[in-house]
């Protein structure tokens, strides 16, 4: 059967390539819903309700990707600050804002602080998972050695 691209058999990663995703979201029900969706796709997921707990965990080990809400508990802009702190630690860490805030100013601010994407919570779970798969696919492609680095040898002639 031809797949629609959204079936479970279309998962691009094997268990040997499991990625760690951190979700920083102060609303437990929302955090748990996203965590369950990511876990169904084979990702290892950790959730944090606030910036302080996330930073404490990230001091030990950075995840492979972070999903952050802009407003965190008593910090209306705590997600922005977390993004700034994470970007200072790693230029390559994929960061996605997933928030109810949908103004252009919010999105531009998040992207300028270093986020790779700025999405609103009305986005469907399949769409969100597809965005995450695409981000990891691009990262993997950038990490693969370029085909131009191959050496071609014919007799005494070597082309590199």
Pin down the residues of each PLM region.
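Conserved acidic carboxylate
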Residues: 25
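Charged docking surfaces used in two-component/phosphorelay signaling
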Residues: 32-40
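Active-site beta3 strand of CheY-like receiver
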Residues: 61-72
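Short amphipathic alpha-helix used as the core "switch/output" element in two-component signaling
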Residues: 56, 77-91
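Short, Lys/Arg-enriched segments at the junction into DNA-binding effector domains
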Residues: 20, 136-160
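Short hydrophobic/Thr-rich beta-strand motif most characteristic of the beta2 strand and flanking loop
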Residues: 42-51, 57
